[in-house]
């Protein structure tokens, strides 16, 4: 007996015998059940491997002598066949081919490449590009004249040259006015005239007509030089204070309210009982 091995004790040997007897008793019961209920022809002292082979055959598996196990009719490829590059698989092999890709080529397009037309039709874009380059800025409309908004600048297909610059209409330039008393800013430098401005209504003092203001376009207050009416917040021209005030400017001392101090009051008088303001004019 070699010196490197350890001798099991008596207790360990007894435990090993007990486990082996228990295993054999369980195996004997399994074999008896297979003989009675499964009609298996097993010998009295059979090997466990033989029992496993019989169970595999009953379940539809094939067990060879070397232990190779596979389903019946689906023998796997040999290892040597795989090394030699053989691709012939058994009929019931577990190898499944991937399904055909669900790729549907899109219809052929002239501008976008498709699987059937990977490069696209580049010649179809040439007429469109030629038509785009042939449109010179002179063919596009130019808006000018009596317009409140700024002139529309057409998009240029290429950089403008000296002969392509469009000169504004002289009528539009004549509408530009530079105020004398206004501040020197780009807002007051070039202002197009208001197309809705009525000079006759301005001379007659019609406060309901639209009036022009420097630096603005649209319906605004009139342009009046400063220094005319020192008592009011907004300078007014001569002869315009009485007409511009809602009511009569001469009655301002009697409680008449100017437009920049309160609401608009008509010529007729309203009784104090129907007044909707928070305060009363008598208590003021």
UniProtKB/Swiss-Prot annotation:
GO terms for molecular function: DNA binding; DNA-binding transcription factor activity. It comes from Arabidopsis thaliana. The keyword rRNA-binding does not apply. The gene is BEH3. This is BES1/BZR1 homolog protein 3. Residues 6-88 are annotated as: Required for DNA-binding. Residues 98-114 have a biased composition (Low complexity). Belongs to the BZR/LAT61 family. The keyword Transcription regulation applies. Residues 1-21, 85-116 are annotated as: Disordered.
């Amino acid at each position: 007996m070699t010196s490197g091995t350890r001798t099991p004790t008596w207790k360990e040997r007894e435990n090993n015998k007990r486990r082996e007897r228990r295993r054999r008793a369980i195996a004997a019961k399994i074999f008896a059940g297979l003989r009675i209920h499964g009609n298996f022809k097993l010998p009295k002292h059979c090997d466990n491997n033989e029992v496993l082979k019989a169970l595999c055959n009953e379940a539809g598996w094939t067990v060879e002598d070397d232990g190779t196990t596979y389903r019946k009719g689906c023998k796997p490829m040999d290892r040597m066949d795989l090394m030699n590059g053989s691709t012939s698989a058994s009929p019931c092999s577990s190898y499944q081919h991937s399904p055909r890709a669900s790729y549907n080529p899109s219809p052929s397009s002239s501008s976008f490449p498709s699987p059937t037309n990977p490069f696209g039709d580049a010649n179809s874009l040439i007429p469109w590009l030629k038509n785009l380059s042939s449109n010179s800025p002179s063919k596009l409309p130019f808006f000018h004249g009596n317009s409140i908004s700024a002139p529309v600048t057409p998009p240029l297909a290429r950089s403008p040259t000296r002969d392509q610059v469009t000169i504004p209409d002289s009528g539009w330039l004549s509408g530009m006015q530079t105020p004398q008393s206004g501040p020197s800013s780009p807002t007051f430098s070039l202002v197009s005239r208001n197309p809705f401005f009525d000079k006759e209504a301005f001379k007659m003092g019609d406060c309901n007509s639209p009036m022009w203001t420097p630096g603005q376009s649209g319906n605004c207050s009139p342009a009046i030089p400063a220094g005319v009416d020192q008592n009011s917040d907004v300078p007014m021209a001569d002869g315009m204070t009485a007409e511009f005030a809602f009511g009569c400017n001469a009655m301002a001392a009697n409680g008449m309210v100017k437009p920049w101090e309160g609401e608009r009051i008509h010529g007729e008088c309203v009784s104090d009982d129907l007044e909707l303001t928070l305060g009363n004019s008598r208590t003021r």
